[in-house]
Amino acid sequence: MRIAFVVLLGAHGLIHLLGASKAFGWADVQQLRTPISALGGTFWLVAAILLVGAATCFALGAQWWWWFGLPGMVLSQVLIAQSWSDAKVGTLANMVIAIPLLLLLLDARPGSFRSRFARDRDALMALPAHPMSLVTETDLTILPPLMQGYLRRVGAIGRPHVRNLRVTFDARMRSSATSPWMQATATQYEFFNPPARLFYMNATRTGMPIDIFHRYVGSAATFQVRIASLFSMVDKSGPVLTRAETVTLMNDIVVMAPAAVLDLPFTWKTIGERALLATFTNAGNMVSATLAFDAAGDLVGFLSSDRTQEDAKGSRNVPWSTPISGYREVDGIRIGALGDANWVEPSGEWTYGQFEIRSIAYNVTR
């Protein structure tokens, strides 16, 4: 779908060169019978540049592609109206181009998930913050040996304690083991004093844009999904969801900001040569998970029975697993950049989410 839109946008822009060619005598354009002045030809050329520029920006994933696309589409339609008998079919292309532009407009309104996400982020960023001291070997003495080794491997020693993080993902999601995958991108902010989590995802299913917003601030979590920023698919809240989101928060901490365990209410119990039982408490919710480490000391597995699976029949406790791999250095920290989200059902384990970290930054101000 993305490629098709880029091709349409780019081709539509290039076609406008016909108007410029006719006006400046670059070519004998028999398809355009309406006379075009030199000034008119300049406008046709500008429309071509704007639309091709928009296609290029869209192909590169630039969010501001509409800076070119919107004026290009408007100018294009004005020119088409002036040469209606020859160019009216171009209106169909402009109608298609108008759809994502309309969705962007809806996304910018105050009640959209994107706007709410930004307001929550700014409010949490505005909370008083104190300078963060550096993590030392002495700090690690409160942890079991497996966690000490893990923090050394990720490179936490000598870096500041973690106040917050910002991470972006490429992702694939599906609703069942047999459902088709939908592509997605996501941005997440995590705060650790006090703990909070904001997760905003854009996905596409059969060409339809879907917005997903997880919000866990204070003692309550919400989970909402909308189609095209307008039509609600999911709107959940309450203690069961908050407990499940506490597990997600715990997972994010040990995977993406392991040094934050030094400043949060975690307890530990060694249950094997390469496994720990970790317990985390937040907002009255105490949740646990088994952390598995490989021979090198990297965290490779997280398994919790305190998370609920939501389906058409309601919610039920199902073991939740997140295998972790693809360790590499990101923003000076060595983390597992690849992760799956799995449900471990009696019939077997299946993956409903696959995530790859594109970027991560710690102690951010924006």
Outline where the language-model segments fall:
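Membrane-interface extramembranous regions
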Residues: 1-112
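N-terminal mature ectodomain segment of secretory-pathway/periplasmic proteins
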Residues: 148-231
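Short, hydrophobic/aromatic-rich segments at coil-to-beta transitions
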Residues: 161-168, 192-200, 271-279, 300-301, ...
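Short solvent-exposed loop/turn micro-motifs enriched in small/polar/acidic residues
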Residues: 181-183, 261, 271, 283-286, ...
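Short amphipathic beta-strand and strand-loop transition segments with alternating hydrophobic
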Residues: 189, 265-270, 325-326
